[in-house]
């Protein structure tokens, strides 16, 4: 198992949690973004900078992910592609996407996109709560314990 992080929009506190878990378990972890993502110098922790552009980081993750790899992302279409390839997808808010839940999440995302494109203000996501941080860390620990 490897961990791939869609780091373009990953909160710093979640990146720090991922690094600690990767260090503790010696799992290889790669942060993929279109900008420099500072990561500690460890043999199993890497940063991959891709060119700027729409979905370039996502496409790079999809290209590299293998069955049973874990992808940390809040990007619903990326999570869907990862699950289709046999990987695991966990949001930075602690939601583990599954084959059973991803289609509903895609439908909600598409509906919200339609509303935004028609001029309706939908607002952004709320700030990351302590509960969500804990939920993320707990899910991550459970996934890494099963590998």
From Swiss-Prot:
Disulfide bonds: none
InterPro entries assigned to the protein according to its UniProt record, in alphabetical order: UPF0178
Pfam annotation, one family: DUF188
Family per record: Belongs to the UPF0178 family.
Family annotation (NCBIfam families): PRK00124.1
Protein name: UPF0178 protein VV2566
């Amino acid at each position: 198992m490897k961990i791939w992080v869609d780091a373009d929009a990953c909160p710093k506190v979640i990146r720090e949690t991922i690094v600690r878990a990767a260090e503790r378990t010696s799992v290889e972890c790669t942060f993929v973004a279109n900008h420099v993502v500072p990561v500690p110098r460890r043999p199993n922790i890497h940063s991959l900078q891709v060119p700027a552009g729409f979905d370039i980081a996502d496409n790079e993750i999809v290209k590299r992910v293998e069955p049973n790899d874990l992808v940390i992302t809040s990007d619903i279409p990326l999570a869907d592609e990862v699950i289709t390839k046999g990987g695991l997808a966990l949001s930075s808010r602690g939601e583990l996407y599954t084959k059973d839940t991803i289609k509903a999440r895609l439908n909600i995302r598409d509906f919200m996109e339609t509303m935004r494109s028609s001029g309706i203000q939908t607002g952004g996501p709320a700030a990351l709560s302590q509960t969500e941080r804990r939920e993320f860390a707990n899910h991550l620990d459970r996934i890494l314990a099963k590998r």
